[in-house]
């Protein structure tokens, strides 16, 4: 796991805790923000594991609930009757064969109208019963499929959450490194110092949106990306955009990644028209 990626994540978690009014934060206050961000990651790990365990338990419960439906579907028996669906279909087929024979005899001129009507009625009843049985079977199978689909989805979610949780110990270990915390502090300090200019820059490339109406997570991700791309100039545009998109995938809603990607690419395209001031201070020697 890359140190700078962890630093970006810490900074994102710390942005939400920045005071709205303080003009300048002390280094101690910023350090406290990062410690709070690390604690948030630890809590997220426990929550992720708990959620995964709950999803696995629900999957197991659903599988047990599906057992009676599977048995009912395999039996495919009518309420109050012992004949299987196959027997009922065979019965209907025999009635139809008898009816066909009677019709042939009728064409020969020797027919009994009452017998024809009775055979037709019997065939109709048999087919109706078979149709109802098929409908009941289809309903049971649909219920089983729905349950199994939910089990698969829950299992997939649990696997994904476990994958995230397994990466957390490494992330938490790297987050304690001095170089990681130093870069996260650098991002937070630059964001706090240049917040108004950053917001104006972003508003200039938003199409049909007001920055204040953008979701908090997406807005903070965009701000940190501008810090890297146009204030610290510590990462190439492509790297900063890709990293911002990854943060949006992890912390934003399903549309967040595409939104962040589009805004930042428009920002790069507009740079020749509205260049941002270069910060003369070095960005450090961390590599993305």
Swiss-Prot record:
Family designation: Belongs to the NusB family.
GO biological process: DNA-templated transcription termination; transcription antitermination
GO cellular component: cytosol
GO molecular function term, any single one: RNA binding
Natural source organism: Synechococcus sp. (strain JA-3-3Ab) (Cyanobacteria bacterium Yellowstone A-Prime)
Record Pfam families: NusB (PF01029)
The protein, known as: Transcription antitermination protein NusB
Presence of the UniProt keyword RNA-binding in the record: yes
Annotated function: Involved in transcription antitermination. Required for transcription of ribosomal RNA (rRNA) genes. Binds specifically to the boxA antiterminator sequence of the ribosomal RNA (rrn) operons.
Residues forming coiled coils: none
Keyword terms, alphabetized: RNA-binding, Transcription, Transcription antitermination, Transcription regulation
